[in-house]
A protein has these predicted regions:
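Basic side chains
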Residues: 2-3, 51
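Sec-dependent N-terminal signal peptides of Gram-negative exported proteins
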Residues: 3-21
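Cysteine-dependent hydrolase recognition
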Residues: 22-368
């Protein structure tokens, strides 16, 4: 295992243009609850007092279907329009910056098309466009929409500059997993190590993003491994990025890390956010060749496993995003380290919206 070296000029330069960030709180959050779902209601009841969410900031949907995937017409009728109505009725369109969905709110929208022209997307990523839609703008369903906030680290997040909502999800395998997210977000502290696990020492694009992330953080806080070995068993981890099941040498479902409160995760994996249903205990990751070993249509690692193991935030993908539209670790972790909250850190790192990305976590989580 090789620890990275730090170019101090890079670290100083990263924040050279950073503006003072205004403190955000529960009044800036719209919490979306499916009142037809017991788990969704229970999550809301726990989160509301923890973050001081005003009751007018709680948007109650009535979605009877239990499927994680819905078609476009149901998304518009049962999710997007009711949320827009909640924002308008409560006079919150401008003040709300973050939308938080919960278990019981559909996860993904099915649609025709393939590849970069696919009309399928994550519910949360489509909801990010709701602010602009409420202002009268329309967007094509096919393919990603450029994220105006991407890499704009020098500017505070405001609707005047960035006409979107930052949408995260409180989700896990069960209530205890989600309770853990909330509790750990409140206990987040600026300590621990950032672990970057390259799948080899080659100069692939994803590997270079990991190298750049390592150089943008204090060297005594970074572990970077460029060997073919998969990093496991690390302790005091506050950030992790790697290739997940796309690393040919990874065969175990869990990494066995000890995660600190506030720990964030990125993986370069196509379908890690495909479901929050719990796999059988004996299931583990595999290859695309062995269909019998797949879970929920894929053999790949799962976002929910990181949350279950103790991470506080994790990105994921409901369908194939393509590497260039993954969150960028070289943007996420420096932003988080330098004071951005969870939602802003992840969305700064994502090139596209109306796409396959989800962010699991409390948007207000911040290192202190």
């Amino acid at each position: 295992m090789r620890r990275s070296t730090l170019a101090l000029g890079w670290l100083a330069g990263y924040c050279a243009g950073c503006s003072a960030l205004p403190a955000q709180d529960g009044t800036n959050v719209l919490l979306v609850v499916n009142r037809a779902d017991k788990l969704s209601r229970r999550i809301a009841d726990y989160y509301i007092p923890k973050r001081g969410i005003p009751l007018k900031n709680v948007c109650k949907l009535d979605i009877l279907e239990e499927d994680e995937e819905i078609p476009w017409d149901k998304y518009v009728e049962e999710v997007e329009r009711p949320i827009a109505h909640c924002l308008t009725k409560a006079g919150l369109r401008e003040h709300v910056l973050y939308i938080v969905t919960t278990m019981g709110v559909p996860l993904k929208v099915s649609g025709p098309g393939e590849g970069i022209a696919a009309e399928s997307c994550a519910v949360d990523s489509e909801l990010a466009l709701l602010y602009s839609k409420m202002k009268g703008k329309s967007f094509p369903r096919a393919g990603p929409v450029p994220n105006p906030f991407y890499r704009r680290k020098e500017q505070p997040f405001t609707h005047a500059s960035f006409p979107i909502y930052l949408v995260t999800r409180l989700a896990g395998y069960d209530f205890d997993d989600v309770k853990g997210i909330i509790d750990r977000s409140l206990a987040a502290r600026d300590q621990g190590k950032f672990v970057f696990d390259l799948k080899s020492d080659d100069d692939s694009e994803g590997n270079n993003w990991l190298r750049t992330a390592a150089l943008a953080l204090p060297k005594d806080r970074v572990v970077m491994d460029e060997s073919v070995k998969v990093v496991t068993g690390e302790k005091d981890v506050i950030g992790y990025a790697g290739w997940g099941s796309n690393d040919p040498n990874r065969h175990q479902r869990n990494l066995g890390f000890q995660w600190l409160p506030g720990a964030l995760v990125i993986e370069y994996v196509s379908t890690d956010g495909r479901t929050f249903r719990r796999p059988p205990a004996e299931w583990t990751i595999g290859t695309w060749k062995g269909v019998a070993g797949w879970f929920d249509g894929s053999p790949q690692t799962l976002t929910a496993d990181y949350i279950h193991e103790g991470a506080t935030g994790c990105s994921g993908h409901v369908y194939e995003p393509f590497l260039e539209l993954n969150p960028r670790p070289d943007v996420l972790f420096p932003a988080y380290f330098h004071g951005r909250n969870l939602a802003e850190s992840y969305y700064l790192s994502m090139p596209g919206l109306s796409w396959q990305n989800i962010v699991v976590g409390d948007p207000l989580c911040k290192l202190k």
